[in-house]
A protein has these predicted regions:
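Electrostatic cytochrome c docking/interface patches
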Residues: 34-74, 122-123, 155
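Short cysteine/histidine-rich zinc-coordinating motifs and their immediately flanking basic loops
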Residues: 94-100
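Sec/Tat-exported extracytoplasmic proteins
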Residues: 61-68, 86-89, 117-122, 141-148
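C-terminal capping alpha-helices of c-type cytochrome domains
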Residues: 56, 112-113, 123-155
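Bacterial N-terminal signal peptides that target proteins for export
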Residues: 3-16
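The canonical Cys-X-X-Cys-His
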Residues: 57, 79-89, 137, 141
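Short microdomains enriched in Cys/His and/or Lys/Arg
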Residues: 103-115
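Small beta-barrel nucleic-acid-binding modules, principally OB-folds
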Residues: 12, 18-45, 95
Length: 155
């Protein structure tokens, strides 16, 4: 059966719909993947906010009780901090996530692994994946591992 006669009209119709959607999106207020390069001022704001989270994450990673209290989290009930098992952020490998995580026996994200460490070895209370504490820990861990090539799914 020759399907080329049916395929061409479908292709043309699909292309027309895609073009129309693009045109409709261009007139909206919604930004479409950086229409223009960011200004130096914008980049400074972005970096300053990121580094605020990195500094907070560093405090949490190293067991700062005041930072935990301010955020309402309990990362450990054993007196352990993330840095005790991962000095200088060693053996964290955020560039490998998501992946199958042997300790958890499931496919996991970095946030899943952070909570696993909080709950299991540290006997702390899991933190919400969208919380400021989680964002800060994640920012610090990624920042500490900058330069590592992305390798999701590897060990």
């Amino acid at each position: 059966m020759d399907t080329s006669k049916r395929t061409l009209p479908l292709f043309v119709a699909g292309t027309a719909v895609a073009g129309l959607l693009i045109l409709l999106g261009l007139g909206s207020e919604q930004a479409i993947a950086h229409k223009r390069p960011h200004t130096a001022e914008e980049l400074k704001v972005f970096n300053d906010v990121f580094m605020e989270y990195v500094v907070l994450g560093d405090k949490l990673f190293h067991g700062d009780a005041k930072a935990q209290e301010e955020l309402g989290v309990t990362l450990s009930k054993t007196g352990m901090a993330c840095a005790m098992c991962h000095p200088s952020n060693v053996d964290v490998h955020p560039n490998e996530f998501p992946k199958y995580q042997e300790q958890m026996q499931e496919f996991a994200t970095l946030r899943d692994m952070i909570n696993w460490c909080i709950e299991k070895p540290n006997q702390g209370e899991p933190i919400d994946s969208d919380s400021e504490a989680m964002k800060a820990l994640e920012a610090y861990i990624y920042w500490s591992s900058r330069g590592s090539p992305l390798a999701p799914g590897t060990h």
